[in-house]
Regions:
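Membrane-proximal envelope and lipid/glycan-remodeling enzymes
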Residues: 1-481
Length: 481
């Protein structure tokens, strides 16, 4: 048992598909294409219900596709497209129900079937979904529909609570290691920690994410303008905007906000979706209807200039997503894929320590010690207590009988933490890295009796590596003598 994934639903879905069709590399890609298509169809259907014109729908669908950006998410092959789909549908149905004075005929004082079905999926697809659940439950409570709020929360929490109990009974934490180790939980024992807890972390992360910052500014302006136009708080469009804003601040406060367009993708798509419907009400139906008061022309110019500055980060995201996608696939092939092939060829069923467990464990059948802590409980416990340095790594790898280690010897990873007893056998370095943790992987001898074997294996595998990988170190110097 391993509690390593923050997406329980995606893990279950892939397991079912692999059980039926066998383990393969194509299923994640195909699933992401299917879910992206479902997103486009769902958003299109919702926009049609609001009688938005085809040209307007086309522009926003194009924006959602490339700003989110779906091409990158499809090739990543993880749960993020399904996360976007569930988040959009949940926000749409929640706002629709909250905007009503009374519960629908499908419920006496209970939730509509659509929300009851979606609520457990929201945290199951990613634990960040709990932010959405918290926001919507709070809004139902403010709406004085406490039974609705309670029911929605219970339906959402029961599945992850059952998983948490299962995890605990197996000796792991209640939450997956990935959630605990990657989340932002400030130390409230200090004044700085208290300040971070009350929004400073969110503020800093927003400044580091200009595309999210733009969306927040845009929806705040739209929300304020509509409020001044007598749009009440419980109006459908206002609700979707409010849910997006509060969820974004919670995510930026407590969660990862960037890693190759993954973690913030649902926020970007949700923000664009939340803007689209209420914004249309204030656009002129024809360009001829736009009248410009020449006496305040400088104000128009200033407003246009400000708008361009706000929109630039969005176009920058589109540009870099397109440019970086082929680079990213090359990065994974040159680093993670080659590491997996190397271990598969030479270290079958062998105890190995690594810090990036995904592709390696998919390709090779090894006894893996995850020194980053996602897949190894001993490491996670040490990192949670703040005691994880050279001594702990040396003792743990010795206890586990680890033969070799493949690590990033870089700042933020294992710089200054490599045990002195280990011997570096070599390095692989990729160029133009945009997605891997670091561009250089170091190979270490952990068990001294393995040194000659590791060097021999690296020398043999050196001729199988793509020539774009820069090899160096002890083994490579023997090749080039």
């Amino acid at each position: 048992f391993s509690s390593s994934s923050s997406s329980l639903l995606w893990t279950l879905l892939l397991s079912a598909i692999y059980f039926i069709f066998g383990v393969n590399e194509f299923s994640p890609f195909i699933l992401n294409v299917i879910f992206t298509t479902a997103i486009i169809f769902s958003v299109y259907t919702i926009f049609i219900k609001y009688k938005l014109p085809p040209s307007y729908i086309f522009v926003f669908l194009l924006g959602i596709i490339f700003i989110t950006p779906f091409p990158a998410l499809i090739f990543i092959g993880m749960e993020h497209t399904l996360h976007v789909l569930i988040a959009i549908l949940f926000v749409y149905f929640s706002a629709k129900e909250l905007s009503k004075e009374r519960p629908t005929s499908l419920s006496t004082n209970s939730m509509p079937v659509s929300l009851l079905m979606l609520s457990p999926l929201v945290p199951l697809i990613r634990y960040e979904g709990l932010f959405l659940i918290l926001v919507v439950c709070s809004l139902f409570a403010l709406r004085k529909r406490l039974q609705n709020s309670f029911l929605l929360g219970i339906f959402a929490i029961i599945p992850i609570a059952l998983y948490g109990l299962t995890s605990y009974l197996h000796g792991w934490f209640w939450l997956p290691n990935s959630v605990l180790l990657k989340g932002h939980l400030p130390d409230i024992k200090s004044a700085t920690g208290v300040m971070q807890l009350f929004g400073y972390t969110s503020y800093k992360n927003l400044l580091k994410s200009p595309h999210i910052f733009f969306l927040i500014i845009a929806v705040l302006i739209l929300y304020s303008y509509r409020h001044n136009k007598q749009k009440e708080v419980w109006e459908n469009g206002q609700l979707m905007i409010a849910i997006f804003i509060i969820t974004t601040f919670l995510h930026m406060q407590f969660s990862l906000f960037y890693w190759f367009y993954r973690y913030d993708a649902y926020l970007v798509a949700l923000g664009l979706f939340a803007i689209a419907i209420p914004l249309y009400e204030y656009l002129p139906s024809r360009l001829q209807q736009i009248s410009i008061n020449k006496t305040i022309l400088p104000k128009y110019v200033a407003l246009l200039t400000l708008s361009l500055f706000l929109i630039l980060p969005i176009f920058s995201r589109i540009k870099w997503a397109i440019i970086q996608l082929p680079r990213a696939t090359t990065n994974i092939y040159e680093q993670q894929y080659q590491m997996g092939l190397f271990l598969k060829q030479f270290y079958h069923n062998t105890p190995v320590a690594v810090n990036d467990i995904g592709a390696i464990n998919f390709l090779a059948d090894i006894k893996c010690l995850d020194l980053w802590g996602l897949g190894s409980m001993e490491v996670a416990r040490n990192k949670r207590t703040g005691e994880f340095g050279r001594k702990q790594i040396y003792d743990l790898t010795k206890t586990k009988g680890i033969k070799i280690a493949l690590l990033y010897e870089s700042k933020g990873w294992f710089l200054g933490k490599i045990p002195f007893q280990w011997t570096k056998a070599g390095e692989w370095r990729i160029s133009n890295n945009v997605v891997c943790g670091k561009d250089t992987v170091s190979f270490y001898v952990v068990d001294p009796s393995e040194e000659n074997k590791l060097i021999a294996n690296l020398k043999q595998f050196a001729f199988q590596l793509p020539n774009t990988i820069k090899q160096s170190g002890k083994y490579y110097s023997e090749i080039t003598k």
